[in-house]
Amino acid sequence: MSEATTTTTTTSAPRPGGRPSGPRPDRGPGGPRKKRPFQRRKVCRFCAEKDTTIDYKDPRTLRYFITERGKIVPRRISGNCSKHQREITEAIKRARNLALLPLAAGHALP
């Protein structure tokens, strides 16, 4: 009684939706990606203008740091330093609790 073993070889066909095997192609017909031009670093406006203060009772100032959807704008976009970003976040949350600022996009601004 000998058992016959059959060996099957599978060809490496690309799976549907998978990445093709082999070396990476070039970046496309346009060639390699171009580098972005140097962008000027944003400066914290509260550090630059010492007379401006962060106050939760001033929704006009805080609206600058809120998106259309009602989310708090991150530091990398607003350009604030970490100290003032924390103060802004705290002030926005306090203003939301007092209904001076909207909680979400569907709520109207006063």
From Swiss-Prot:
Region (Disordered) location: 1-41
Chain ranges passing through the membrane: none
Classification via InterPro entries: Ribosomal_bS18, Ribosomal_bS18_CS, Ribosomal_bS18_sf
Keyword RNA-binding belongs to the record: yes
Coiled-coil zones: none
A cellular component term, taken from the record's GO annotations: cytosolic small ribosomal subunit
Keywords: Ribonucleoprotein, Ribosomal protein, RNA-binding, rRNA-binding
Assembly behavior: Part of the 30S ribosomal subunit. Forms a tight heterodimer with protein bS6.
Entry protein name: Small ribosomal subunit protein bS18
Species per Swiss-Prot/TrEMBL record: Trichlorobacter lovleyi (strain ATCC BAA-1151 / DSM 17278 / SZ) (Geobacter lovleyi)
